[in-house]
């Protein structure tokens, strides 16, 4: 920890500020410096990123630098950015430096202050036990089950439903599991953050959640560090309270994007596709801290925007290596109205192993994937020659596959006001039973529309009766 000292602003280049100190007073890397912005009268936090010689440091501002000028006095706090952690933070909304931004007058009580930069837990502290986290979303629980204390990526281009799925998971964890969730809004739309806050207030799940935002309009420094702020809050509940916590990051691509902006401003030579040369290190520093220890776990769900739907782009490709499960959202399924638009063939999980999930679940999941793959292979023949040219066996496969595709959809609670269909939470054993019975041919006589946007298989049977009456 460096000593407290004072310096002066030397240069301001957008969000990058150079500060000069007296001989022997240099701050450490990642120390927080504070300057009062004369234009707003508010304190602005700068984080030290580089030592540039001549007793000067290069810092990144965590808020706008409009109004700063050369010669302004800067104070070194002598420690990294510290944010409030603990029960008192639940139900509140913060910015990157841990200041409440929800407009509430109440003071934050019952909290400690932890630095956002920490070493990950050592190998001896980490836990390796394997357990499934039930989400209540059929397509995920069946084909890409989430490991408790693992990392899950939601891959998808713009507008395929990543944020809606993240919001549904927060709701399900809070209401069905009574768990705590931390949400980091990284470089996404402020409007979406506002909607999330209001929806959570309405669903009465806000008291179990902490929201931390560094949105699109904020400088790259704030967007680059906001995920660490939320992670630090999650670490408190894991390490001190011994809880299983969920950490939602929307969107991890914006974290990489902000890192790329910061890197360029700090004068580093860009690497592949213009990304920062430190891409793997930046990602590793964040991801290695998201883990299970012997005290508790952090399960992380990360929405990952795929630029131009190119999965080989360095940002999504670097994220892939850290994940235990990948949920790929498909534009084709979204276009067909099959929500959640999860691609059942591209989505994978390391948990899909008979030794972990049991033989029955494994066989049903593989049976569903097999029949959907066969249907995909037959689609070219159907497009050219029509259904009539198929063998009876293939016709049956197509019929069952179309029912399975529709049964993989389900109404979500957070979209009730748009769809007017009440949301459904489906327990994992009901999910397995439903798909097993479809594969066995028990419902070959029911119309495929009966399986669309329902919860359990019993609801599909009931819907079929309603359709027959019409």
Swiss-Prot record:
Protein family per UniProt: Belongs to the ATPase alpha/beta chains family.
Keywords carried by this UniProt record: ATP synthesis, ATP-binding, Cell inner membrane, Cell membrane, CF(1), Hydrogen ion transport, Ion transport, Membrane, Nucleotide-binding, Translocase, Transport
The EC number(s) this enzyme carries: 7.1.2.2
Species name: Thermosipho africanus (strain TCF52B)
Reactions that this protein is recorded to catalyse: ATP + H2O + 4 H(+)(in) = ADP + phosphate + 5 H(+)(out)
Membrane topology according to the record: Peripheral membrane protein
GO cellular component: plasma membrane; proton-transporting ATP synthase complex
UniProt subunit comment: F-type ATPases have 2 components, CF(1) - the catalytic core - and CF(0) - the membrane proton channel. CF(1) has five subunits: alpha(3), beta(3), gamma(1), delta(1), epsilon(1). CF(0) has three main subunits: a(1), b(2) and c(9-12). The alpha and beta chains form an alternating ring which encloses part of the gamma chain. CF(1) is attached to CF(0) by a central stalk formed by the gamma and epsilon chains, while a peripheral stalk is formed by the delta and b chains.
Protein's name according to its UniProt entry: ATP synthase subunit beta
Gene3D superfamilies recorded: 2.40.10.170, Bovine Mitochondrial F1-atpase, Atp Synthase Beta Chain, Chain D, domain 3, P-loop containing nucleotide triphosphate hydrolases
Gene: atpD
Matching InterPro entries: AAA+_ATPase, ATP-synt_VA_C, ATP_synth_F1_bsu, ATPase_a/bsu_AS, ATPase_alpha/beta_chains, ATPase_F1/V1/A1_a/bsu_N, ATPase_F1/V1/A1_a/bsu_N_sf, ATPase_F1/V1/A1_a/bsu_nucl-bd
Its job: Produces ATP from ADP in the presence of a proton gradient across the membrane. The catalytic sites are hosted primarily by the beta subunits.
Residues holding ATP: 156-163
SMART domains: AAA
Example GO molecular function: proton-transporting ATP synthase activity, rotational mechanism
Compartment(s): Cell inner membrane
């Amino acid at each position: 920890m460096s000593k407290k000292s004072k310096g002066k602003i030397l240069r301001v280049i957008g969000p990058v500020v150079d500060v000069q100190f007296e001989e022997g007073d240099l701050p450490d890397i990642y120390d927080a410096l504070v300057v009062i912005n004369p234009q707003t009268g508010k304190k602005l936090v700068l984080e030290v990123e580089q030592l540039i010689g001549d007793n000067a440091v290069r810092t990144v501002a965590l808020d706008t630098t409009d109004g700063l000028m050369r010669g302004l006095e800067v104070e070194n706090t002598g420690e990294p950015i510290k944010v409030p952690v603990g029960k008192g933070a639940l139900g509140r909304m913060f910015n990157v430096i841990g200041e409440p931004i929800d407009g509430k007058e109440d003071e934050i009580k019952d909290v400690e202050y932890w630095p956002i930069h920490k070493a990950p837990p050592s190998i001896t502290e980490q836990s390796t036990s394997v357990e499934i986290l039930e989400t209540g979303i059929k397509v995920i629980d069946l084909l890409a089950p989430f490991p408790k204390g693992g990392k899950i990526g939601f891959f998808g281009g713009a507008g395929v439903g990543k944020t809606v799925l993240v919001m549904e998971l927060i709701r399900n964890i809070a209401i069905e599991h009574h768990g705590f969730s931390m949400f980091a809004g990284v470089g996404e739309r402020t409007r979406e953050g506002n909607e999330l806050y209001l929806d959570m207030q309405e669903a009465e799940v806000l008291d179990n959640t902490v929201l931390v935002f560094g949105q699109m309009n904020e400088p790259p420094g704030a967007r680059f560090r906001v995920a660490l702020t939320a992670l630090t809050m999650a670490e408190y509940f894991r390490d001190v309270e011994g809880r299983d916590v969920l950490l939602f990051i929307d969107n991890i691509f914006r974290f990489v994007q902000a890192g790329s902006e910061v890197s360029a401003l700090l004068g580093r030579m860009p690497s592949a596709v213009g990304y920062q040369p430190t891409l793997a290190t930046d990602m590793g520093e964040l991801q290695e801290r998201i883990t299970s220890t012997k005290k508790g776990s952090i399960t992380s769900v990360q929405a990952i925007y795929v630029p131009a739907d190119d999965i080989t782009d360095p940002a999504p490709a670097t994220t892939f290596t850290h994940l235990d499960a990948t949920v790929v959202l498909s534009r084709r399924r979204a276009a067909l109205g099959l929500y959640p638009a999860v691609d059942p063939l591209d989505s994978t999980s390391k948990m899909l192993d008979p030794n972990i999930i049991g033989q029955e679940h494994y066989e049903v999941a593989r049976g569903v994937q097999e029949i959907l793959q066969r249907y995909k292979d037959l689609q070219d023949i159907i497009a050219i020659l029509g259904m009539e040219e198929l063998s009876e066996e293939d016709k049956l496969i197509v019929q069952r596959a179309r029912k399975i595709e529709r049964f993989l959809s389900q109404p979500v609670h957070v979209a009730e006001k748009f769809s007017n269909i009440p949301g459904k939470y489906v327990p994992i054993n009901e999910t397995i039973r439903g798909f097993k019975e479809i594969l066995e041919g028990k419902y070959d006589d029911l119309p495929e529309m009966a399986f669309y946007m329902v919860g359990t298989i019993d609801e599909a049977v009931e819907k079929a009766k309603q359709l027959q009456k019409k």
